[in-house]
Amino acid sequence: MTLPEIAVERLSVALGAEVRGLDLAVLDADGVAMVRDLLLEHLVVFFPDQHLAGDDHVALGRKFGELEIHPNLPSPEGGPREIVELRASFGGTADEWHTDVTFSARPPIMSILNHVETPEVGGDTMWSSQYAV
């Protein structure tokens, strides 16, 4: 497959890029390799305007390897076990500094977040590069 022309905008010196022009719902092996390369280069990669349902989200994750079931957080009722839903209206928040399952003997290479709605106040998500410290 010929990869689409994408736009990559670096967001800071230490980490982060925004990628446009790539549809994550139909990613083939070449696209997966491109995303992996972008992740290794930028450490955090944002893909705005993606609309992945739960099963599509899981299918995307599986293209990068075996998925982990989060050991401490519940999955949405009736949804895929690989997905954790943090919804403030249900009491779910992650409003303190944390890392995603790095305590595991074999921590996952990445986390895939699907940000659906941002509150008018708060709701900020920040990333930190441990390479840069």
Give the ranges of each region predicted by the language model.
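Non-heme Fe(II) oxygenase catalytic core, chiefly the N-lobe of the double-stranded beta-helix
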Residues: 2-133
